[in-house]
């Protein structure tokens, strides 16, 4: 598929896995989410960038998608701040295009699955296609170390949580601290012995990009802390915990990315509307002893939460911090704190 479009960002050529989000807002939060490393992000909404940009919407200190595609990218200031989104993307050096037939592109990805693609302001079609065909797939790639930040602390009271940063959003860090926990952030690749040497009351595993099965160092670290302190994971962290517990993951046809995904809790049947951003899912065709599925997607029946009560471990596939989005699952940060201090 070849789509004509108009450049409104930085010039250049960008390659990656083509994905789409159905979120109507939160465009600045989306492009600063490290989970989009290695991907070209398409917004399905007819217009983005219609309320400006501001530092309060940043989930990290940089833009992570290789390129941004939209039908229309606004450039007016707004309630978020005085700088328009189009100008902000250009200043960040991001390849961004508009006037693309995003409806056609999204339907193609929906019908044929995630695939490699590229955006270029400088190459011809055949040159770009040749580069796309040579570009590596995300499968088998551990991107957690590249997406992780440095060591840092947040919060000065409450139980101490060691958060393993695989590409953690600022909103998740704020959610942990806001629930009354002192958070010590360490990068992906930190060993179990190094984590336990910090004397944590609990361990958290963050979201992030790449193939969870390839994140062997984090999986090994989790295996070394399970049963010693309470463990909680979100998104990629949910998938990595699942691997440490003996489950496996598989690639979804086109992923879950949006702010209106219904998830049902097994314990009481309550449905939560959730924010999601993932391209892999946990496979629960053979549950190890002591592991249970706690939440399920009402869109496709995929696993959205697991727990191993005897090992003090639990995780969810979706984002309870929801920046922006519904806060149906915000209680999960407090629930983790309650488990830690119990």
Located regions from the model:
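RNA-binding accessory domains that recognize and position tRNA/RNA substrates
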Residues: 1-189, 193, 197-198, 212, ...
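Proline-centered loop/turn at the N-terminus of a beta-strand
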Residues: 95, 160, 230-232, 248, ...
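Cysteine-nucleophile active-site neighborhood
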Residues: 197, 201-202, 207-281, 325-340
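A glycine-centered loop/beta-turn motif at secondary-structure junctions
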Residues: 305-341
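Phosphate-coordination loops involved in phosphoryl transfer and adenosine-cofactor binding
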Residues: 157-160, 228, 290
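Active-site-proximal beta-strand elements of phosphoester/diester hydrolases
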Residues: 160-165, 274-275, 314-318
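Catalytic beta-strand/loop cores that center a nucleophilic Ser/Cys/Thr
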Residues: 269-311
């Amino acid at each position: 598929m070849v789509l004509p479009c108009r450049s409104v960002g930085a010039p250049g050529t960008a390659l990656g896995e083509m994905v789409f989000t159905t979120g109507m807002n939160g465009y600045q939060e989306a492009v600063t989410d490290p989970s989009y490393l290695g991907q070209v992000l398409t917004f399905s909404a007819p217009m983005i960038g219609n309320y400006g940009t501001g530092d309060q919407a940043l989930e990290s200190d940089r833009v992570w998608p290789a390129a941004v595609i939209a039908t229309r990218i606004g450039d007016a200031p707004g309630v978020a701040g005085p700088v328009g989104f189009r100008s902000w993307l250009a200043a960040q050096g991001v390849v961004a295009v508009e006037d693309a037939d995003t409806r056609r592109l999204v339907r193609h990805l929906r019908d044929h699955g995630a695939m490699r693609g590229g955006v270029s302001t400088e190459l011809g079609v055949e040159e770009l296609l040749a580069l796309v065909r040579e570009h590596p797939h995300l499968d088998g790639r551990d991107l957690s170390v590249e997406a992780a930040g440095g060591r840092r602390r947040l919060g000065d009271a409450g139980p101490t949580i060691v958060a393993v940063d695989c590409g953690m959003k600022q909103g998740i860090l704020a959610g942990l601290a806001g629930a009354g926990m002192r958070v010590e952030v360490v990068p992906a690749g930190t060993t179990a012995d190094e984590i336990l040497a910090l004397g944590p009351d609990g361990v958290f595993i963050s979201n992030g990009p790449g193939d969870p099965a390839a994140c062997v160092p984090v999986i090994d670290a989790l295996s070394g802390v399970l049963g010693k302190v309470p463990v909680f994971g979100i998104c990629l962290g949910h998938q990595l915990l699942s691997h440490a517990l003996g489950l496996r993951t598989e690639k979804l046809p086109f992923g879950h990315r949006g702010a209106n995904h219904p998830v049902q809790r097994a314990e009481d049947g309550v449905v939560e509307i959730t924010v999601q951003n993932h391209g892999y899912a946990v496979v629960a065709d053979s549950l190890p002893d002591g592991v249970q599925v706690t939440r399920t997607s009402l869109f496709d029946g995929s696993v959205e939460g697991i727990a191993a009560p005897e090992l003090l471990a639990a995780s969810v596939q979706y984002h309870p911090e929801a920046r922006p989005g519904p806060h149906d699952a915000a209680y999960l940060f407090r629930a983790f704190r309650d488990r830690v201090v119990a």
